[in-house]
């Protein structure tokens, strides 16, 4: 039991959207709730999950559990991303550009939640195409997954980090 309590404190969670969905049956409509939640430790790990249940708190709980099972590690350089990247999912795309210290997180709604919980403090971003919250979150995560730091690029090219910058 103590381990689960530690795990809960480790991650911060943010509810992005809660949506009421209806199933039409012979007797009328049956309502359920879907929740989209982003979790992160503000130290380079972030994930998202969706949950569906008859009550809102239960849907959020399911979404948090799903999010913790699907975490991504985000490379960061001085509170921002190592380079410019565009994340895509469906018809939605998110353009992210590193920013100077003190700029802050310039992003809208779902994208902001993901970036802040990933521990990124300075970044410029623009959402393009579909603005559905789930697509925006997935596009942001896609972009963050495709980030590479200088050490990784140097290793791929068989060079040292110093050779890359000269």
UniProtKB/Swiss-Prot annotation:
NCBIfam families: rpsE_bact (TIGR01021). One of its GO terms (cellular component) is cytosolic small ribosomal subunit. Keywords: Ribonucleoprotein, Ribosomal protein, RNA-binding, rRNA-binding. This is Small ribosomal subunit protein uS5. Part of the 30S ribosomal subunit. Contacts proteins S4 and S8. One of its GO terms (molecular function) is rRNA binding. GO terms for biological process: translation. The N-terminal domain interacts with the head of the 30S subunit; the C-terminal domain interacts with the body and contacts protein S4. The interaction surface between S4 and S5 is involved in control of translational fidelity. Residues 11-74 form the S5 DRBM domain. With S4 and S12 plays an important role in translational accuracy. It holds the Pfam family Ribosomal_S5_C. Coiled coil: none annotated. Gene3D superfamilies: 3.30.160.20, 3.30.230.10. The lineage of its organism: Bacteria, Bacillati, Bacillota, Bacilli, Bacillales.
């Amino acid at each position: 039991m103590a381990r689960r309590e530690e795990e809960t404190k480790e991650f911060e969670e943010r509810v992005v959207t809660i949506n009421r969905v209806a199933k039409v049956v012979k007797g009328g409509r049956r309502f359920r709730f879907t929740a989209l939640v982003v979790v992160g430790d503000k130290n380079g790990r972030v994930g998202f999950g969706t949950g569906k249940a008859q009550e809102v708190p239960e849907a959020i709980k399911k979404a948090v559990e799903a999010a913790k099972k699907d975490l991504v590690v985000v490379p960061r350089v001085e509170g921002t991303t190592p380079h410019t990247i565009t994340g895509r999912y469906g018809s939605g795309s998110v353009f992210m550009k590193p920013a100077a210290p003190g700029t802050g997180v310039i992003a809208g709604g779902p994208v902001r939640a993901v970036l802040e919980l990933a521990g990124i403090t300075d970044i410029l971003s623009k959402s393009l195409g579909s603005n559905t919250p789930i697509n925006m979150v997935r596009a942001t995560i896609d972009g963050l997954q495709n980030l590479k730091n200088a050490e990784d690029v140097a290793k791929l090219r068989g060079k040292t980090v110093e050779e890359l910058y000269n």
